Amino acid sequence: MFGLKRNAVIRTQLYCGGAGLGAGSGGASSSGGRLLASGREATTRREGGGGEAGAVIGGSAGASPPTTLAPDARRVARPSPIGAEGPNVSATPPRLLLLAPPCRASPPEEMEGPAADAIMSPEEELDGYEPEPLGKRPAVLPLLELVGEASSGPGMDGSLPSTPPPAEEEEDELYRQSLEIISRYLREQATGAKDAKPLGGSRAASRKALETLQRVGDGVQRNHETAFQGMLRKLDIKNEDDVKSLSRVIVHVFSDGVTNWGRIVTLISFGAFVAKHLKSINQESCIEPLAESITDVLVRTKRDWLVKQRGWDGFVEFFHVEDLEGGIRNVLLAFAGVAGVGAGLAYLIR
């Protein structure tokens, strides 16, 4: 009777999923063997996804072939309940383990290339963007560029635009002082009479600059009268449009990049020579536009140089030596007249 009970226990273990005793333990059973068989069965089920359990139960552990991992071996499935012969139908669908480190998902294949590169966050789009400072933008286009565009355009003669100056120019002290001095000098040369109206701004500095310009400019006109006449005939100035076209000549004077007070005073002196011509042909109304053209090109294109030279104060200081020589000449002439030296000394100091 004891043998019958033992056989019943063995059959019960086989039915409930226990280890095969005939092959694995040589016909003997113990609590340690059952635990070992149960652990081996659970390991086999986990590695095989629950589908290899029947093969292990039906045969011996040594006779079963080695388990081959399927391509989806990384899929995790719940182990089957004890006594179940197949996988648990109540288990959730297996999920694929994501072993990649957490990072931003890469774009799909069809978006690789320029489309994928275009995907940017708002922070990336604004990174490195710096608005252009307003103070660095020029208030007006340099006059030299305007002259170049006008001269290269179809049907244009290189004349300056007749638009009024902006507010920045009206408040420009260097431009205002230059226009006042040049305009006064050209009018006085054309009419041959002194203007009694006082100069604005810094009256002492402007008056000194005007006196220096009159002295030096008159000498330039006397020394280069023949050259000025040839230039005037070539330009054939008759009206205001011709006066504005002088800007091309003025720009050409400084085209080689050399700037000095000698060139500047020669330019203004030629303007005074043209002003006399305009007076002779009853075109006095063109004298003011002529002064504006000279001032525009001079101040707009040579502003940095003029500022470094201290403007009209530097102009007066530069020709101060010439003024000293003029004073010495006057003293010598007076002495020669008193002493009766004669015309020989006057010729030498001329």
From Swiss-Prot:
Tissue expression profile of the protein: Detected in peripheral blood mononuclear cells and bone marrow.
Any single biological process term in GO: extrinsic apoptotic signaling pathway in absence of ligand
Compositionally biased tracts (Low complexity): 31-41
Cross-link type Glycyl lysine isopeptide (Lys-Gly) (interchain with G-Cter in ubiquitin), residue numbers: 5, 136, 194, 197
Modifications after synthesis and translation: Cleaved by CASP3 during apoptosis, yielding a pro-apoptotic C-terminal fragment. Rapidly degraded in the absence of phosphorylation in the PEST region.
Motif (BH2): 304-319
GO cellular component: cytosol; membrane; mitochondrial outer membrane; nucleoplasm
Keyword Transmembrane helix: yes
Modified residues (Phosphoserine): 121, 159, 162
Intervals of motif BH1: 252-272
Keywords: Apoptosis, Cytoplasm, Developmental protein, Differentiation, Isopeptide bond, Membrane, Mitochondrion, Nucleus, Phosphoprotein, Transmembrane, Transmembrane helix, Ubl conjugation
Residues recorded with modification Phosphothreonine: 163
Function text: Involved in the regulation of apoptosis versus cell survival, and in the maintenance of viability but not of proliferation. Mediates its effects by interactions with a number of other regulators of apoptosis.
Family, similarity comment: Belongs to the Bcl-2 family.
Protein name: Induced myeloid leukemia cell differentiation protein Mcl-1 homolog
